[in-house]
Amino acid sequence: MLHTEGHALLRAVGQGKLRLARLLLEGGAYVNEGDAQGETALMAACRARYDDPQNKARMVRYLLEQGADPNIADRLGRTALMHACAGGGGAAVASLLLAHGADPSVRDHAGASALVHALDRGDRETLATLLDACKAKGTEVIIITTDTSPSGTKKTRQYLNSPPSPGVEDPAPAPPSPGVCTSPSEVQLQTAGGGRGLLSPRAQEEEEKRDVFEFPLPKSPDDPSPSEPLPKPPRHPPKPLKRLNSEPWGLVAPPQPVPPAEGRPGLERLAAEFNGLTLTGRPRLSRRHSTEGPEDPPPWAEKVTGGGPLSRRNTAPEAQESGLPSGLRQKLSRMESVELDTPGHFCPDSPESSRLSLERRRYSASPLTLPPAGSVSSPRQSQESLPGAVSPLSGRRRSPGLLERRGSGTLLLDHISQTRPGFLPPLNVSPHPPIPDIRPQPGGRAPSLPAPPHSGAPGSPRTKRKLVRRHSMQTEQIRLLGGFQSLGGPGEPGR
């Protein structure tokens, strides 16, 4: 069978052949190489049984000098120090391993350290060496006790002895067993065999109880006895809290505390308890930004709702107007007559005004209807028949105290159009009014325009009404005015 160098090194170390192991290491073998179980050459040297104990110490020293690591663990978690303690390597081998950095506090997968393995082996010298190493590293002294399990096997336990806290008084003096070990020489080792077999079972139980140390839990000196009831701390009333930006449903009045029902009969006490569970009345919450609820509407809402139905613009059919009440119809006709009774408009009693109002109603019923091509109408009628024009129905929305003035040149164009019956229909009762002189003056001054006639006395309420101007002049009126100025020039080529 062919063996690799690692396995050859393990076989050479296991058989105690130091010279062969030296040749293998000098030939390039790795000192920390392990087999399938994770066992290294150093572990094999600690477990081996040599005829001469000095050969084991010499082999371990040589491997450590070649760089072997004493803290490498195998598949079971055991190190070379554990193998030395369990295999009876002796105190010399343990000292060599500890001198090269072996840790005595490391535990294997079963939870046993090198101290436990040394105690199971019963090697006092090795155990003392391990305790000295723990003390040199500043580790607390470890107390180990051996106990027999109910099945009859030995079971070793390891405890960490910590000094008692200050202020704790022992009620009874401690037994002469080693409570706190000051040196390894004071540690008493006891195993399951030996003198225990000569004692009675009851004496063995007492001795086992004495070996296992029990550390009482610290108690405060002013700790009251369990028979005395603990006084309840005083409960302070809860502080009133102030809600900031809370929800409306959280603004509920806190329930009033119910007085104690002591001294009352059974039924009254039960009724008081049930009454304490009822919720108190909630305050009425005011609604903001909501149209629901029985609250009174604001005064401006009464003014809005108090008015009549709103008229539609350019889409109101004539049938709807005929279906209005007689009182509302008279009011609307009065408002229309007041609007039409402005400077440049007809009198409400004239036949021309009634004919014009009928034409306005017919053309304003639909924004897309236009007069026939053969009919001749005035510019004002053609303007109001357009979709963008304002129908007389839309004028009813305005207050009767506000009158409109559509342009600054309206009166002048009306007077000019009165003298040209072939261009526009007559708008005045007088058939032949004089043509105003609109030619430019020789001095360069602008021609003076006639002032609009007053429709009433200075003190009449009609003259005090406010005139609303939408725009100064319309494009059609400006074009007509420019044409008349060219016709009324000094040469008068058009005549």
Curated annotation (Swiss-Prot):
| Superkingdom of origin | Eukaryota
Q: Would the keyword 4Fe-4S turn up in this protein's UniProt record?
A: no
Give the compositionally biased regions (Pro residues).
Answer: 223-232
Its keywords, alphabetically, are: ANK repeat, Methylation, Phosphoprotein, Repeat
Asked whether the keyword Phosphoprotein is assigned, the reply is yes
Pfam families noted in UniProt: Ank_2
Q: How is it modified after translation?
A: Methylated at Gln-15 by N6AMT1.
Q: Where is the composition biased (Polar residues)?
A: 147-162, 180-191, 375-385
Q: Which positions carry N5-methylglutamine?
A: Q15
Q: From the Swiss-Prot or TrEMBL record, give the protein name.
A: Ankyrin repeat domain-containing protein 34A
Give the classification, highest ranks.
Eukaryota, Metazoa, Chordata, Craniata, Vertebrata
Q: Which gene encodes it?
A: Ankrd34a
